[in-house]
Amino acid sequence: MSLHTVRRGFDIRVAGAPAADGRADELRVPSRVALLGADYPGMRPTMRVREGDSVSRGDVLFEDKKTPGVRFTAPLAGRVAAVYRGERRAFRSLVIEVNPDERAGGGGSAGHAPSGWSGRHPDALTDETVRELLLESGEWTAIRTRPFGRVANPETRPRAVFLTATDSAPLAPDPVAAVAGRDTDLEWGAAAAAKLTDGPVFVCSRAGRRLPAPEGDRVRHEAFTGPHPAGTAGLHIHRLAPVRRGHEAWHLDAQDLASIGKLFRTGSGDALRVVSLGGPPLRRPALLRAPIGASLDDFAAPDLEVGAGPAERRVISGSLLSGRTASGEVTGYLGRYHRQVTVLEEDRRRRFLGWLAPGAAAVSVSRAYLSSVLPSRARGLTTGTNGSRRAIVPIGTYDKVMAFDIPAAMLCRALLMEDIERAEELGVLELIEEDVGLLTFACPAKNDYAPALRRVLDTLEKEG
């Protein structure tokens, strides 16, 4: 095992973290689950169901018109309640009303085994058989690719596969604890992942928290230590197998890996994931088990501080750095790749001469505030930006939090100007939205770089 030390970055210590024991004893199965278009950029669905249809767990809901063979399946049994579309008929979400029996059973129905399932170990199967089973079951959608951050194309073969067993985002659950006791599923899953590439399979974990997956000729364990983004797949790929046009890498996380292993072992993957529910407004942060795509409208309600209405809280699917607001019947659901739900206080206040305050409770990457010399502790972060958008000033803040070997200020400028050629020269193909979350947080100009990055990536992909 090699140890990789990350020097640049920033850990945001936020109040409201769940207990560190990693136990997720509580199960929450909501009345609705959904598949969200925002999870699959560039995907164009070909619908296989319509509103009112009854579906069982594992039934095909739609396929990707742009990538034939990639199927998106129902996470739980129920009835298709609605299919929502936006401007120019862009797919936004498909909502399933969960069967009462499914809810009473804790979302544990096995569904139907794929026709290609044999119960044999992946080592005894051909590469093509492994791919067909993943596609038929819908588990293929757990695999994402760099560059571009799309669901992997089954017609291609990556240079390497990354199994991510660490997460350094604020309030994130420990991926190793989330799959504790599932050594067999992890071993079968790693064997299946090795069938997807002729190159190495990297198992990336935090130093001292190794994932119990066997090491082999092509399965290599790598340990990372340091501040965020030390626990992101993008940085692991950047360090171990950098991507560019024609050189892909695929990645998936530990819980999806265990689900794939269970699929090959039993004929059915997991409908549930361990999810962290955290944030300063919560009186009882917790680790929960919840289905993929769970409705978040009432998910955090039992744990909010008394006396606060929903308008004063923002529920975020994912990390506070790279997640998205999740509310309402259209998009108020847990994202496919999100393992945490973050709740923050809405802060619309404007502080007169706030920049003159000592900032004893401020969360900042600079040393301009008193908090930088006080003992490190978790702080009550809100949604406030402490100012409006302004011009970029390259004072070194960006480079301080940019762990990639990319000139951060130049990258930010290229993204905002949509200078496609310059962005590609700088290495934008190695990034997706979560990789620029710290740039947004640290930006003195209050810019959000994730949408700008996605526009640049879409243009690069379209132009080939």
Sequence positions of predicted segments:
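N-terminal, Lys/Arg-enriched amphipathic/low-complexity engagement segments
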Residues: 1-50, 221-224
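Short, solvent-exposed loop/turn positions at domain surfaces
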Residues: 43, 49, 66-69, 284
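Short, well-structured beta-strand-loop connectors
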Residues: 49-63, 81-82
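Short coil-to-beta-strand transition motifs
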Residues: 69-77
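Buried, small/hydrophobic-residue-enriched core segments of structured protein domains
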Residues: 84-298, 302-464
